[in-house]
Structures are given as C-alpha cells and as structure tokens.
C-alpha cells in the first residue's frame, strides 16, 4: 500500500510538470483566450461558468496582476479572472480552471493573488461549455477596474494612471475569419495585426502560409507586409506589419481573403514547389516562440 501511494504521488508530480501542448485546445474560445493572454492589453469577456450564479468575466489583466477578484455586493458582486497574472504555472489552461473554480466557491469582496493550479481544480471543460465563444470587449484604458460609485483612494488612482499610461491602442479585427485577430499600434512607425489562427496540423498550416506567400498574396493590401509568426500555447499566429495611419477597420476584406486562401491550401498535400519551399524556410526563420 505504501509503495502504491508513493507511485501515485510520483505520478501526480509528473503530471504537474508536464506541459499541456494546447492549454485551451478543444474550446471554441481558444483563439480569443490565447490572444487575451498574450497580445491584448485591456479587454474582458463574459464567461458562463457551470453551476455558478455570479456574472463571471475573463480579463486580460486585473489590478496588481492578481488572479481573480469578486466585487463587493454593493458593486454588483461580479467576478473577474485574469489571464496575464504575476503568479502562474506553465499550464495556463489549468490555472484558468483553478481561478474559475475559486470564483465559484468564494464570496463577494474576496481576492485570489496566485492563480497557480495545485491539482485541486476540475478540468476546464467541466467549468465552461467547450462550444461557447467569447465576445471580447476591448478597452483603451483600465477604467473598468473601478466599479461605478466606488471610492478611489490615492493609491488606486496612482496605480490606475500608471496602468492607463501603459496601454497600447488595440482593436479586434476580422469579423468573419477563423480564430481571433487584433490590431495594435505600439508606436515606432508601425502598427501590427497578430492573428491567432488555430489549426490541428501545424506543418499543413505552415505549408499553406508558404503557398499563399509564393503567390504574393500573404499580405493585407498595399503598404502591408507579412512579418513572421508567433508560436504560443501550441498555436501559430501570423503577424503583419502595417501603416499606423491606416484605419484598423479597413483590413476586413483582406483578412477574409487571406483566411479563405489559407483554408483552401491547408488541405493541399501536393509537394511544395522550389519557390514555396523557399517561402517556407523564410517563414520558419521568422518565428518567435512566446511559450
């Protein structure tokens, strides 16, 4: 019996050390969650949590980069769970499940500092509906941190000012595309669109990017350039450089065109031509792994 419990404890330790290749895989909200965790400064989205009677919102970042908070009853008692947190494990999907489970079982006024999952959390799919999508509300400041009518202490006001000063203008783009794309202007004379586009076959997706690039169509119109890809949370996110003076809403048509071209090429299993191979090497040389 002793040996069995030792083996079980060891197996549990091993499981905790393993990294989930796609922490949000299997969820319709996968791309939105990844984008909010990695690319979007200030945003939140309502998330229905099974068996929870509170309004729950998943957010990019909360005051102090804390994991979760439940507002006092006098301010509505809504709960917020942060994705960009100070304290976490290498498995963001389990961390989110841990924080959502905490929200479910705690009272208004409570705050969770660390989101680090400890193995006590249920599976994410047991807490949220896998087919639910997120309606992401992007903000250009963090004023939503403060509930209406709440007292703002000088300390809170100062931290809010600092947070607001750090916000990069961002907007969601691409109404009808696969995944989630966000435009951002970080300054330096260039704006970007980062497009989290889930695909189950990584090499087929990279080949599709190469084929579309070889045709000269991997761009979002005049004055734009394909910059490379980010790898994060088991997904590939193409990035485009843009003119910051051009309105973010003007890329809809081009995003839809590129999305359609990629979708058609993903199922193309013919050998790559010499030019397509060259494009593939170029794409691979411009990839940055975030986590």
Language-model regions, residue ranges each:
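Arg/Lys-rich, low-complexity, intrinsically disordered N-terminal tails that contact nucleic acids
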Residues: 4
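Short Lys/Arg-enriched alpha/beta "domain-start" segment
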Residues: 13-71, 132-160
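Internal, hydrophobic cores of structured domains that mediate oligomerization or house catalytic pockets
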Residues: 73-189
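Intrinsically disordered, Ser/Thr/Pro-rich regulatory regions of eukaryotic transcription factors
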Residues: 180-182, 193, 228
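Short beta-strand-to-loop capping motifs
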Residues: 195-200, 240-244
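Short, internal acidic amphipathic alpha-helical interface segments
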Residues: 199-231
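Alpha-helical oligomerization segments
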Residues: 223-291
């Amino acid at each position: 019996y002793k040996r069995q419990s030792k083996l079980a404890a060891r197996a549990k330790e091993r499981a905790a050390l393993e990294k989930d290749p796609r922490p949000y895989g299997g969820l319709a909200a996968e791309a939105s969650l990844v984008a909010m965790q990695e690319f979007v400064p200030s945003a939140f989205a309502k998330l229905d949590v099974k068996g929870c009677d509170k309004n729950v919102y998943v957010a990019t970042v909360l005051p102090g980069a804390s994991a979760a908070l439940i507002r006092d009853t006098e301010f509505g008692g809504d709960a917020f769970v942060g994705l960009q947190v100070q304290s976490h494990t290498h498995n963001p999907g389990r961390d989110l499940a841990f924080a959502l489970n905490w929200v479910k079982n705690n009272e208004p006024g409570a705050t969770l500092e660390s989101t680090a999952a400890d193995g006590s959390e249920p599976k994410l799919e047991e807490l949220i509906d896998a087919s639910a999508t997120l309606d992401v509300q992007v903000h250009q400041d963090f004023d939503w941190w403060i509930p209406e009518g709440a007292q703002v202490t000088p300390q809170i006001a100062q931290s809010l000012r600092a947070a607001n000063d750090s916000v990069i203008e961002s907007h969601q783009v691409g109404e009808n595309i696969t995944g989630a794309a966000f435009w951002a202007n970080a300054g330096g004379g260039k704006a970007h669109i980062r497009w989290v586009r889930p695909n189950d076959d990584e090499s087929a997706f990279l080949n599709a990017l190469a084929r579309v690039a070889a045709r000269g169509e991997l761009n979002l119109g005049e004055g734009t350039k394909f910059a490379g890809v980010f790898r994060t949370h088991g997904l590939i996110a193409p990035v485009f450089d843009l003119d910051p003076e051009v309105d973010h809403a003007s890329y809809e048509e081009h995003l839809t065109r590129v999305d359609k071209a990629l979708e058609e090429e993903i199922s193309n299993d013919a050998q790559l031509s010499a030019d397509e191979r060259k494009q593939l090497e170029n794409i691979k040389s411009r990839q940055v792994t975030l986590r």
